[in-house]
Structures are given as structure tokens and as C-alpha cells.
Amino acid sequence: MVVEESAQYQPGFVQLLTGDFNTRYDSKVFTSVRSGGWKESYETIHGEGEAGFTGHAFQGVDYVKGSSKGRIDFIWYRGQVKPVDAAIIKDAINGKYPSDHFFMQADFVIE
């Protein structure tokens, strides 16, 4: 649905697609997203799509991942925009995490 919806805009139109996708980087969902011309910011900057687990059940870096592994939070982009930085933010305040997922961050320039 996202691929079809985004295709209605001119090719250079800047679009961002972000969030907790609850699916791994190598899934069929992302194969479909890529086929629509979307690129993933962390992969573009760091040369790798898999950057470790981003969900942590409010336990942060101490979370035991079990059988689930891999990043499920992404910042996708298309159009005349380019990421210049991307990171996984693992900050806590007084030992408490504001979310059960680490935050994804990306800085872009509009071309």
C-alpha cells in the first residue's frame, strides 16, 4: 500500500517513512518497499542494514535478546533528499528508558 501511495508523487518529491515496522530488515515487506524506490538511512550512512536489535523491553543495553534479533525500527527515504548522518540512540535518563525501543535518528539535506 505504501509503495503504491508514494508512487503517485513526482519522482523528486521528498518522502520519509519511519517507525517500528515489527519486521526484520531482510523481510518480504522491505523487498517491496525497496522496489518502490525507497532507501534506508542507516544502511546508506553505515553501509549495513543490520545494526543490532532496537527493541529492548525497557531494559536497554542489558536486554537479553533471545531468539528475536535484528533491527525493526527504520527511517526510509525517497526523492531529492540525502541522509548525512544516522544513528541508534541508546540514551537513558537516570537509568530509565523513555521507550521500549532505542530511537532511530537521521539527518537529511534536501537536494
Task: State where each predicted segment sits.
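Metal-dependent phosphoester-hydrolase catalytic domains
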Residues: E4-L16, F21-E111
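Catalytic-adjacent loop/helix segments of enzymes that bind and process anionic phosphate/sulfate esters
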Residues: M1
